[in-house]
Regions:
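Acidic Gly/Asp/Thr-rich repetitive segments characteristic of extracellular carbohydrate-active
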Residues: 67, 71, 245-291
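Short, aromatic/His-centered strand-loop micro-motif at the edge of beta-sheets
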Residues: 151-173
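Extracellular glycan-recognition surfaces and repeat-rich motifs
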Residues: 51-85, 294
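Secretory/extracellular carbohydrate-interaction modules
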Residues: 82-148
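Sec-dependent signal peptide cleavage junction
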Residues: 21-39
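Flexible glycan-contacting loops in extracellular carbohydrate-active proteins
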Residues: 197-225
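Right-handed parallel beta-helix/beta-spiral solenoid domain characteristic of secreted/periplasmic
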Residues: 293-323
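Short tryptophan-centered beta-strand motifs in secreted/extracellular beta-sheet-rich domains
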Residues: 170-180, 185-187
């Protein structure tokens, strides 16, 4: 089992991974060529834009089995998918069996899901999602079972860890970040890192299938707004990234003029030895947790610091992280 640790109101340096360094760095005013991370959005499905469930995009399929699937109206998100199974029997699922993500091409994989666990009667387990390789081995898992009070995940085989609180009948943003090279992953719920650097259920060098499902005696109802799976190549050239309260997460982040805005954006990126992450002086990020992905080495650390003039930036790490 993995040790669990709560981080509440700690200093910024408490959440830095191995090979990271806190410092203040002057801004270089010249132009710098930056190698862009090669990112491929492998598959995405967004039910809010759909009129019906016919002809789903990008190899997504729904299997009703002993359950029922509907495109329903939601007061917050418009159209969403409702998957409901009230009796034991065959599997109901939303599935994509053609991810075709291989370690020799992509190192990092992120799965972002906007989901609501329904308050309808439920029993046992609903998988949200299970991810398999081309041989059918289950490599990564996230699921709800029992009284649906917390998400759970398998690590090192079938050892189980809690992976964040379930807010029944409320929309939650769930993100899984997978490192195919290290066979590790992390889970973030609504921007808070709940599991980090934990081992996969099974080691693999590829991902083939993702499935949200309930089968056999498992019952319950879930609502899905969208799912996005992104495979990303590893960067080889270090760079400097900027973060500002006046930034824009849709921009490159590689200059003060194209700075990112949120810690969520920083936390979603993969940093390498020699990278610098600089926060603008005078800025403040409240009730957010900084937990960058990646690590440096003895000779070339990842530097977290500041740029500009004025008061040093403030970050309130008022979240929870399990390691």
């Amino acid at each position: 089992m993995q040790k669990q640790t709560n981080w509440r109101g700690r200093l910024l340096t408490c959440v830095l991974a191995a090979g990271m360094l806190m410092t203040s760095v002057p801004v270089y005013s010249g132009s710098v060529a930056v190698e862009a991370a090669s990112e491929t959005k492998t598959t995405k499905i967004d039910f809010s834009t759909m009129k019906n469930l016919d002809n789903l995009p990008d190899n997504w399929k729904i299997q009703n089995g002993s359950g029922n699937s509907q495109l329903v109206d939601d007061s917050e998100n418009g159209k969403v998918l409702k998957l409901s199974k009230t009796n034991s029997g065959n599997e109901i699922s939303l599935k994509n069996s053609k991810l075709d993500i291989n370690e020799n091409e992509y190192r990092y994989v992120s799965i972002e899901t906007k989901i609501k666990m329904g308050s309808e009667t439920h029993a046992n387990q609903f998988s949200i999602p299970y991810i398999k390789d081309s041989k059918g081995n289950t490599a990564y898992t996230l699921y709800a079972d029992g009284n649906w009070s917390s998400y759970k995940s398998h690590v090192n085989g079938k050892n189980t860890l809690e992976a964040g609180k379930i807010s029944v009948d409320k929309w939650q943003d769930i993100r899984m970040d997978i490192d195919l090279k290290k066979d590790t992953f992390r889970v973030t719920i609504d921007g808070e890192c709940e599991l980090a650097g934990v081992n996969a259920r099974a080691k693999t060098d590829n991902l083939s299938e993702i499935s949200f499902y309930a089968d056999s005696w498992n019952t319950g109802t879930i609502y899905i707004d969208s799912v996005e799976v992104t495979a990303e190549k590893e960067r080889t050239q270090s760079a400097t990234f900027y973060v500002s309260n006046n930034g824009d997460d849709s921009k490159a982040g590689t200059s003060p003029e194209t700075a990112w805005k949120s810690l969520d954006k920083v936390n979603s990126q993969h940093f390498i030895a020699g990278d610098k992450i600089l926060f603008e002086c005078g800025g403040e990020w409240k009730n957010q947790t900084l937990f960058p992905q990646g690590s440096g080495d003895e000779n070339s650390k990842i530097t977290i610091g500041s740029y500009g003039s004025g008061n040093l930036p403030k970050i309130s790490t008022n979240g929870k992280m399990k390691d």
